[in-house]
Regions:
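Hydrophobic alpha-helical segments within soluble ligand-binding/sensing domains
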Residues: 118-160, 261-282
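Flexible loop/turn connectors
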Residues: 250-302
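Pocket-lining segment of extracytoplasmic ligand-binding domains
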Residues: 171-241, 247
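Short, low-complexity disordered leader/linker segments with a strong preference
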Residues: 1-30, 55
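Beta-alpha junction/loop-to-helix N-cap segments that form part of ligand/metal-binding clefts
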Residues: 65-125, 222-246
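Short beta-strand elements in bilobed, periplasmic/extracellular small-molecule ligand-binding domains
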Residues: 50, 55-75, 134, 180-200
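An alpha-beta-alpha
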Residues: 31-33, 49, 136-186, 283, ...
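Extracytoplasmic "Venus flytrap"
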Residues: 30-50, 56-58, 64-74, 168-172, ...
């Protein structure tokens, strides 16, 4: 073998070695995902997140997806396992999961999604849109004043408005306070009363009481209500009481109308934040909590027709 040929072979081997070295040095990431329970909105947010991150990072990323089955103790167990594994990031899908993650670690980046009120969830006294901690994410809060307008627009003669929600969910308590305030600001003269349940054991009895006393029921974005939407519908529909909801998944199960965000889009936005942190070194403590960019009015035609409720032209069918 002549010297020139030997040199070419050596150069080729060196180049190959450099390529192997570059590939082996490519960063890999593990993201732990904990979803509170199984229902459409949360699943769409998880899917949107995974799709976006997978599209951008490909084989560099793996996901450990866990469902807490609606149990707060399971949230803690799952999150603690992620921390022990030293995952690169945690996606906390819902408020209780976010709270568990924020308590478990101050070093692993935590992104929340399907979380309505970050200051309340994290017990932050001052709020300027960033947490200043290892936590950020996306909020699923649709404009609550517009939801209040929807109640008044669709059921203008209501004498009593019932707000049905789980008292154990901070998101729901926040939305209830905001809806009350918005109804008052809009000059609503109806009596507004809370009907709170503590979990699945008393949701039927509380819903029955609400249906017996109210002209319309409002359900905010509430995980327990979402998981029991069919039960709520089986009580409210025979009682001919319309239900207006804070998100699409609940509305499909028991409502007549909703002003909703796109949870898949919300997950995609959260995924964009994740890639920025993992690949670009963005500081999670300085990342502003983001929201879905679009909301839309939707209605369920079959239920509206049964109740004789006229729907304006700017609503879309569910």
């Amino acid at each position: 073998m002549n010297k020139k040929w030997k040199m070419m072979v050596l150069m080729g081997l060196a180049a190959t070695g450099m390529m192997v070295s570059a590939v082996s040095a490519e960063e890999s990431y593990k993201i732990g995902i904990c979803q509170l329970t199984q229902h459409e909105a949360l699943e769409e947010a998880t899917k949107g997140f995974q799709d976006y991150v997978s599209e951008k990072l490909g084989d560099q990323v793996t996901f450990d997806v866990q469902n807490a089955s609606g149990e707060l103790s399971n949230c803690v167990t799952v999150i603690n396992a992620f921390v022990s594994e030293d995952v690169n990031m945690i996606l906390a899908n819902s408020t209780p999961v976010l709270q568990a993650a924020a308590s478990a670690t101050d070093s692993i980046p935590v992104l929340g999604t399907s979380v309505t009120d970050y200051p309340a969830a994290l017990d932050l006294e001052k709020w300027n849109g960033v947490t200043g901690t290892n936590v950020s994410g996306t909020s699923d809060c649709a404009p609550l004043q517009q939801q209040a307008k929807m109640i008044m627009e669709l059921i203008p003669d209501a004498k009593e408005i019932g707000i049905l929600y789980c008292s154990a969910e901070p998101n729901s308590r926040y939305q209830t306070d905001m809806i009350r305030s918005s109804l008052d600001e809009l000059g609503c003269t109806a009596k507004v009363k809370d009907y709170t349940f503590t979990g699945t054991d008393d949701i039927a009895s509380v819903t029955t009481t609400a249906a017996e006393n109210c002209d319309v029921i409002y359900i905010p974005t509430d995980n327990t209500a979402a998981s029991n939407a069919e039960l709520i519908n089986n009580i409210c529909e025979p009682a001919e009481v319309p239900v207006i909801c804070g998100e699409k998944g609940v509305c499909e199960g028991c409502g007549i109308a909703t002003l909703t965000i796109d949870y898949y889009e919300l997950g995609q936005i959260t995924g964009e934040m994740a890639v920025d942190i993992l690949e670009n070194g963005a500081d999670v403590s300085q990342m502003a909590v983001r929201q879905a960019e679009q909301v839309k009015k939707c209605y369920v035609p079959e239920r509206c027709e049964k109740l004789g409720i006229s729907i304006p032209d700017d609503y879309e069918e569910l």
